[in-house]
Regions:
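C-terminal regulatory/interaction module of P-loop NTP-utilizing enzymes
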Residues: 1-25, 30-182
Length: 182
């Protein structure tokens, strides 16, 4: 803040509900008085914190009543339509966008069975896009196992891999992803 000269902004604290028991009083002080030890958050700055629900992160600690009384909770759900707008603006791979257009139910899922967790997230799709484009650029092998590094559901990864292979095969001069492009 001092280096940039910004007089207002957002101080973002991620995974606030994973703070250790020893740091909890410091976080309470930060939330209540906008102070971290001897450092004060300047006027014009707000504190925004985020955390995942316990079912998605086993390191989550339930916040005590004093802390909860100082925060407002917004529950945010994954929305494929909103994400696709973001993804298009970020240049996410067209095969991913067209696949999700056809199969929006595969955008986000978390399944835990017999201590095995399978998940598909927005971060996974975006990371896949970044690496997929680079692999294509370098002519490297892309297969289902590659997809599973980012799409942590074997079923969805295999389905997307099949779609991707079909997309890479020109159909009448057009790729499937180009037919569904907006």
């Amino acid at each position: 803040m001092e280096q940039t000269g910004y007089r207002e902004g957002i101080l973002f604290l991620d995974e606030i509900n994973c703070v250790s028991e020893t740091l909890a009083p410091v976080m309470l002080q930060l939330l209540q008085f906008k102070k971290f030890g001897t450092h004060k958050v300047p006027e014009g700055w707000i504190i925004v914190a985020a955390g995942n629900p316990p079912e998605l992160n086993h390191a989550v600690r339930e916040m005590d009543m004093a802390s909860l009384d100082r925060v407002r909770t917004l529950n945010i759900e994954a929305d494929v339509t909103v994400w696709k707008q973001y993804a298009a603006s970020r240049g996410v791979h067209p095969a991913i966008l067209s696949y999700l257009e056809m199969k929006p139910e595969t955008f986000y899922r978390v399944v835990e069975e017999r201590k095995k967790k399978e998940f598909v997230t927005a971060r996974g799709w975006e990371d896949l896009s970044t690496v997929l484009k680079e692999y294509e650029h370098q002519g490297l092998d892309i297969n289902r196992y590659f997809m599973e590094e980012f799409i942590r559901s074997p079923e969805v990864a295999a389905d997307f891999d099949a779609y991707y292979r079909m997309d890479r095969t020109c159909m009448g001069g057009y790729r499937i992803s180009e037919l569904f492009a907006e």
